[in-house]
Amino acid sequence: MNKWTFPTQIYAGPDSLNRLTEFNNESILIICDPFLKDSPSLTYVIGLMDSKNKVTIYTDVVPDPPITHVVKGIEFMEGIKPTVIIAIGGGSCIDMSKGIAYFGRKLKHMDIKSFIAVPTTSGTGSEVTSF
């Protein structure tokens, strides 16, 4: 018998983004696809958090990102030392963000308390795995 456990909490529904208002006094890094940078959707998400937190945006995301993009993301992250990472985008964005968070914790000993994925496409499943 095989057993698989993925300790992922999933929030879905029209008000699920409101959970972001629960963050207080955090350094939040939002990693998103470049086309979202000036979108009303991203403005809305930032508005849920920016009055109580320091929010920084990183958009150097490419499809099927090579490890060099993960390294660049870690280098960017070192300057802001986020306590929360939010990935907004498709599978490539979410996977790259998970790599940045993982190596930031393991190699740079950053205190990243929360990783949140907000998928903008369906089908990848990247938001439900920790790897």
List where the protein language model places each region.
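Glycine/threonine-rich beta-strand-loop-alpha-helix active-site module
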Residues: 68-131
